[in-house]
Amino acid sequence: MPKIIDAKVIITCPGRNFVTLKIMTDEGVYGLGDATLNGRELAVASYLTDHVIPCLIGRDAHRIEDLWQYLYKGAYWRRGPVTMTAIAAVDMALWDIKGKIAGLPVYQLLGGASREGVMVYGHANGTTIEDTVKVALDYQAQGYKAIRLQCGVPGMASTYGVSKDKYFYEPADADLPTENIWNTSKYLRIVPELFKAARESLGWDVHLLHDIHHRLTPIEAGRLGQDLEPYRPFWLEDATPAENQEAFRLIRQHTTAPLAVGEIFNSIWDAKDLIQNQLIDYIRATVVHAGGITHLRRIAALADLYQIRTGCHGATDLSPVCMAAALHFDLSVPNFGIQEYMRHMPETDAVFPHAYTFADGMMHPGDQPGLGVDIDEDLAAGYEYKRAFLPVNRLEDGTMFNW
């Protein structure tokens, strides 16, 4: 058996903060796992160092399921983003090791490919509708078959999903959280105009997506869904705060627009009721925050029973290690829907060389043994951790609101 003899946490900031777990075995094979939790990176790093790594030494790296259960059930204080991100990092690293020892890419260990490639969607954003459509046309020219649309709202200085750079979006700021002002009425007026302009310019052969980011009430989300139905949205993401899961039933009663949720979910228990009551169309749970490949497969299997597809979170707050793991999962799972893909900064790609590729709107994890991603530790050491926080929202009267 390949015995775990050591493990360490690597923290680096090549454009943004990433936490990586590296597990070493007595056979000279190592595996990598992403342990990044945006804005709470050091909490996961400490959890791994103090509470997880000591429990890994001497264990059989091939016993992925047993180690998953050990870390989950042995924690007693189960679930939550810190615990599940730490477990996910271990899980990814162990799949990486297993693939390297077997000489196979991880997707082959998951049952093989269910498709030739993974359809991904890019992010088109701009301060105006015109700017956003221009960027969307650029993505379409690059071969993207699905594009997320976000644009600035007149009268609001800053809006979620809109970056200063048309490709690289990183909302976290150094020092203390930025406080933005939010107006729901203005937002509800601009989004249908954005979709109308996009359809007129891009046509009907491209999927259009939108992220509400938890900021609407159920009835507001239903209204927006109705307004967007003529433009055939691929999905509305995070229409309302996911803690109130019964709210999705009310949204369902008012619109046929497909609903997606789950990027903040940490376990199958967070998604179970939404799936079994068929209140969503896409489950957005991601590898690093939902317990790794092992647990995400369980969530997907449950969703498959109800014809609900996957649509994993894939923003730049996940490292290329997680992106690779997601693509192996996507390629193998039968009820795959779509994969979010935000390109990383060149500095990030240099620190994390990877085998996955993009062509004609599709991605593939590559056929290198394991996950097909590595870390240049010398280069990573040159990018020191920088404390950063995600923004917060306030209504115009000063009331705290969902970002």
From Swiss-Prot:
GO BP term, pick one: amino acid catabolic process
Enzyme class: lyase
GO molecular function, one term: magnesium ion binding
Catalyses which reaction(s): D-mannonate = 2-dehydro-3-deoxy-D-gluconate + H2O
Binding site for Mg(2+): 211, 237, 263
Cofactor: Mg(2+)
Pathway: Carbohydrate metabolism; pentose and glucuronate interconversion
Database matches in CDD domains: RspA
EC number(s) given by UniProt: 4.2.1.8
Residue positions of the active site: 160 (proton donor/acceptor), 213 (proton donor/acceptor)
Cofactor note as given: Binds 1 Mg(2+) ion per subunit.
Keywords: Carbohydrate metabolism, Lyase, Magnesium, Metal-binding
Database matches in Pfam families: MR_MLE_C, MR_MLE_N
Binding, substrate: 38, 123, 263, 284, 313, 317, 340
Site entry: Important for activity and substrate specificity: 315
Protein family per UniProt: Belongs to the mandelate racemase/muconate lactonizing enzyme family. GalD subfamily.
Protein function: Catalyzes the dehydration of D-mannonate. Has no detectable activity with a panel of 70 other acid sugars (in vitro).
PANTHER family: D-GALACTONATE DEHYDRATASE-RELATED, STARVATION-SENSING PROTEIN RSPA
Name listed for the protein in its UniProt record: D-mannonate dehydratase
